[in-house]
Amino acid sequence: GSEMCIRDRDKVKQILTEYLQVNGHRKTPERYAILDTIYSIKGHFDIDTLYNYMANEGKFRVSRATLYNTIILFIDAKLVIKHQFGNSSQYERAYNNETHHHMICTECGKVTEFQDENLKQAIANTKLKKFHASHYSLYIYGVCSKCTWAKRRKKKDK
């Protein structure tokens, strides 16, 4: 499910604490606030979205640079996944996040998540030589219905 339960929030805090200790990073309240905010966002987000969330919550004034550097830290700690959709970087929480795939519209750039049991099974049954898979993500590129419709309308108007 997409709702984060309290137990998961505690767990990710614990993962962060261990990561910071092992790597000799400071345990700043900002880092925990950013983590908490990220884990309250459903689906994908970019730095601007995260920045606005943080600003609106008013807990911490965090610069975009700080957010960016913190996210790099979280990716290394396996708490955040980075996606490169065309030229925009999008992020999402990694812990306890069910495997899902992405449909990406090449016209408007909209990213839609979807799950598919058949795909899941097919990938699970795929034999990988000398390789142990930990996770995966599938990107399917195409044109969304909104853009398809807009294109059709343009053709008619000519």
Language-model segments: which ranges?
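Short, small-residue-biased leader/transition segments that mark boundaries at the very start
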Residues: 1-6
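Non-DNA-binding regulatory cores of transcription-related proteins
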Residues: 76-158
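DNA-recognition alpha helix
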Residues: 46-59
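Short capping segments at the starts of secondary-structure elements
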Residues: 29, 41-46
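Short alpha-helical segments that sit at the start of domains
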Residues: 8-35
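Basic amphipathic alpha-helical segments that dock to polyanions
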Residues: 67-77
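Short helix-capping/hinge SLiMs at alpha-helix to coil transitions
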Residues: 25, 39-42, 57-58
